[in-house]
Amino acid sequence: MLIQIAEVFSAAEAAQIRQRLEQADWVDGRVTAGHQSAQVKHNRQLPEQHPLAQELGELILQRLSANNLFMSAALPRKIFPPLFNRYEGGESFGYHVDNAVRVVPGTSERVRTDLSATLFFSDPDTYDGGELVVDDTYGPRSVKLPAGHLVLYPGTSLHKVNPVTRGARISAFFWMQSLVREDSQRNLLLDMDVAIQRLNQDAAGHPSIVQLTGIYHNLLRRWADV
């Protein structure tokens, strides 16, 4: 299931971030790719230990921790520090599946990649191509969001980034280990959480709200990996 999260950053904030990233020194993106991915990865990346990457990564995590939809959809237990990439001049990333486990640089911390995320910083009309294409149950789905918007998708997904033939596509990408490993279980919990919130708005104080909230937490208790 693909989940779009609007306006993690406003358009103005995304533009400021993009301007700072445009002035940074980029390196070959294959430095963080696995053996198979490196054969189809053609882009540039901000070094993981670059001060700007660390500063913006912290800012992204702060925003996401306050975003109700993100927290409900991802149920994050661990989040890999955000990375930043850039595509232009025909650069692309062919079909691949992300590594199942990532080690946080400079630590022994391991993150199981239950979910992947891309946060766009370039406006769609400033570049051609660059669509994130994610294969799911219903076939390939193409994603190209406004600057400041984010997409979540299962880490198990086969996916690619189409060649950028005009302009530049700058984005952040990262992975999460969820409290709930299985995508279908997370989706069910998200649907229930959204329904409870709507019921709270439409019929505040209804006794069913307490019952449904209890069911939600009992399912989470059954499925959570803590």
Swiss-Prot record:
2-oxoglutarate binds at residue 169. Pfam families: 2OG-FeII_Oxy_3 (PF13640), PKHD_C (PF18331). GO terms for molecular function: 2-oxoglutarate-dependent dioxygenase activity; iron ion binding; L-ascorbic acid binding. It is an enzyme of class 1 (oxidoreductase). Gene3D superfamilies: q2cbj1_9rhob like domain, Rabenosyn, Rab binding domain. Its EC number is 1.14.11.-. Keywords: Dioxygenase, Iron, Metal-binding, Oxidoreductase, Vitamin C. The keyword Cytoplasm does not apply. Its cofactor is Fe(2+); L-ascorbate. Residues 78-178 form the Fe2OG dioxygenase domain. GO terms for biological process: DNA damage response; intracellular iron ion homeostasis. InterPro entries: Oxoglu/Fe-dep_dioxygenase_dom, PKHD_C, PKHD_hydroxylase, Pro_4_hyd_alph, Pro_4_hyd_alph_FE2OG_OXY. This is PKHD-type hydroxylase Bpet2704. It comes from Bordetella petrii (strain ATCC BAA-461 / DSM 12804 / CCUG 43448). The lineage of its organism: Bacteria, Pseudomonadati, Pseudomonadota, Betaproteobacteria, Burkholderiales.
